[in-house]
C-alpha cells in the first residue's frame, strides 16, 4: 500500500524478484516474506519505513504459505497511454512467469483459506488472455468471503468481467482520471 513518509512516497515493496520464465513456488514466497521481515527489523527496507501498519512484536511470525491479501501485478500491458501514468506501462511488458501455475501452487497449499482479497492491477489486467482462467482458478469454495478487486480503465468490454460481476466474485475499481 502506498503512503507518504517525510514527503516521500513509500510502499510498493516487491515481494519476489521474478526471473524470466521461472514461476515462483510457495517456498520462494515463504523465503521472500522472511527476508522482508528481517529487512524491516533492521530498518533496511526503505519502502516500508514509516508504514502505519508495522508494529513491534517479540514473536517472529510463521512464514507459512497462508495469504491474507494478494496483489497481482504480473504484467504492465495497457490499452491506454495516460499522461499521468508511468512510462513503463506504455507498450507494456508481458508476464515473466506463469501466473496460473503460481496460483495453482497457492491453491495446493491451501493458501487462500484466510485470504480476504486478491487485487488485480498493473497495466490493464483484463488484457491478459488468461485473465478469466487465472481468476477462476482461485478456489472460492475454500473461503466464500474472498473477493477479487480488479483495477481497470473499463474501456474494453470483457465477457469474463461481466460474468464475474454477475456471480459476485469480483468488484471493479475504474480509473478514469481523464489522463488521455
Question: Where are these predicted regions, by residue range?
Answer:
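Accessory C-terminal segments flanking Radical SAM cores
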Residues: 1-58
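Processing junctions and N-termini across compartments
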Residues: 41-45, 72, 76-79
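Short pre-active-site segment immediately N-terminal to redox-active cysteine/selenocysteine motifs
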Residues: 47, 55, 77-81, 88-89
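Short, non-ligating residues that shape and space the ligands of small metal-coordination modules
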Residues: 57-60, 91-92
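A short acidic (Asp/Glu
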Residues: 62, 82, 129-133, 159-162
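Core AdoMet radical
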Residues: 67-77, 86-100, 112-129, 141-158, ...
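Leucine-rich repeat
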Residues: 98-107, 132-134, 160
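A generic secondary-structure signal
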Residues: 105-109, 137-141, 163
